[in-house]
């Protein structure tokens, strides 16, 4: 999240779950307002970021995220992506971020940070490495990319309800995680903050495609772990993991 300064002058109104931020003369001159209104359009703000970031040499691509709530950046020097989410911090203690429809919605990343810290500590500080591995797999484009936050929440959902184990092998944890995710992606995923509701905005067909890819990856992971543990074929296991 990248906080924008309101300089103490911006105001907003709420209608249901949607928030509308009143724009300024500068916003109007920069074409950042929703047509025929005085409200700052979150989609246009993201596009403004994209147009500026595209000029930087360190980035290979900057584009709108599928959910229209962030700018996705691809770096030249790394294989993973970064999502940039513009936000405003309010005087009542929460943040406003794009809602995907041009308006704004309420969130609070501090709750997320506390949530992931607690669960990671429960599992002896080993969970973050597993999350990074899952995100690396997700970015290999073997299927429709799962949003980083959605993926993280599904993983936390699994490990929040799992007892900590002293016998932690990241390859076996990742194997079993793939199996869990293949089922979890088919269902709605509640926002752990209790703010955004269901985080899984994929249609049923896309959910099934992602689930099939996760199942396929799980089956390969089972083969790889069997090669290593039962057949003592470490080289073959490494090759299978690479698939």
Model-derived segments and their meaning:
Residues 6-9, 89-90:
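Short, charged/polar surface micro-motifs in flexible loops or helix N-caps
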Residues 74, 79-126, 130-132, 197-211, ...:
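Extended, alpha-helix-rich binding/interface surfaces that flank or overlap catalytic cores
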Residues 40-44, 124-125, 149:
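Soluble non-cytosolic domains of exported or imported proteins
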Residues 2-7, 29-30:
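Short loop/turn segments at strand-loop or loop-helix junctions that form parts
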Residues 8-11, 33:
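Intrinsically disordered, low-complexity Ser/Thr/Pro/Gly-rich regulatory segments
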Residues 126-231, 240:
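Conserved nucleotidyltransferase catalytic core and NTase-mimicking acidic/glycine-rich helix/loop elements
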Residues 5-7, 50, 165:
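Acidic, low-complexity intrinsically disordered regions
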Residues 15-94:
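Conserved catalytic core of two-metal-ion nucleotidyltransferases
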